From Swiss-Prot:
Keywords associated with the record: Allosteric enzyme, Hydrolase, Metal-binding, Nucleotide biosynthesis, Zinc
GO molecular function, one term: dCMP deaminase activity
Function: Supplies the nucleotide substrate for thymidylate synthetase.
GO biological process: cytidine deamination; nucleotide biosynthetic process; pyrimidine nucleotide metabolic process
InterPro entries linked: APOBEC/CMP_deaminase_Zn-bd (IPR016192), CMP_dCMP_dom (IPR002125), Cytidine_deaminase-like (IPR016193), dCMP_deaminase (IPR016473), dCMP_deaminase-rel (IPR015517), Deoxycytidylate_deaminase_dom (IPR035105)
Domain called CMP/dCMP-type deaminase: residue spans: 1-171
Protein name as catalogued: Deoxycytidylate deaminase
Residues that coordinate or bind Zn(2+) 2: 104, 132, 135
Binding site for substrate: 153
Pfam families cross-referenced by the UniProt entry: dCMP_cyt_deam_1
Cofactor(s) demanded: Zn(2+)
EC number: 3.5.4.12
Species this protein is from: Enterobacteria phage T4
Protein family (similarity comment): Belongs to the cytidine and deoxycytidylate deaminase family.
Length: 193
């Protein structure tokens, strides 16, 4: 499969995330076949991010007309036409909660492959957002030999890519403008203000 196709599949996988901030998807491909996918979220049985954020009052109702005025796309829909986004002033509180309660897409994809007995030695990982340093270390240890990502995480510390390159992993960026099979109006990524 072409890198642009698999990366767009990663964006579709990201839509399963219940995170009210970033929806991230990862796909592990080997020999032209998808062997694992993952998205960011709470471990099975845990409280979903969007539910916790709603309980804490971190979400703002942004009707559809507000999106046209420059706000980010919908994040959470509670069975109505209302749309909710993470309020900017709660982003740091969300990050603290997320770091304790959510697993990143990259790690979920690696864990699901292991759980299913699929070798990822020599595989390629496609991810919608650049990995954090901890995920970069997990990728470096996993046997993956190539990482393809689309967007750069705005809070990422420099050096995540050095972790991968120092482990002999090729790192490639595919700009979003090269991904033309999806209707981007229907894909939610960052759900904050």
């Amino acid at each position: 499969m072409k890198a642009s196709t698999v990366l767009q599949i990663a964006y579709l996988v990201s839509q399963e995330s219940k995170c009210c901030s970033w929806k991230v998807g990862a796909v592990i491909e080997k020999n032209g076949r998808i062997i694992s996918t993952g998205y960011n979220g709470s471990p099975a049985g845990g409280v979903n991010c969007c539910d916790y954020a709603a309980e804490q009052g971190w979400l703002l109702n942004k009707p559809k007309h507000a999106i046209i005025q420059g706000h980010k796309p919908e994040c959470v829909s509670f069975g109505s036409t209302d749309r909710f986004v993470l309020a900017k002033e709660h982003r740091s509180a969300h990050s603290e909660w997320s770091s304790k309660n959510e697993i990143h897409a990259e790690l979920n994809a690696i864990l699901f492959a292991a759980r299913n007995g699929s070798s990822i030695e020599g595989a390629t990982m496609y991810v919608t957002l650049s990995p954090c340093p901890d995920c970069a270390k997990a990728i470096a240890q996993s046997g993956i030999k190539k990482l393809v990502y689309c967007e750069t995480y705005d809070k990422n510390k420099p050096g995540w890519d050095d972790i991968l390159r120092n482990a002999g992993i090729e790192v490639f960026n595919v700009p979003k403008k090269n991904l033309n099979k999806l209707n981007w109006e229907n894909i939610n990524e960052f759900c904050g203000e």
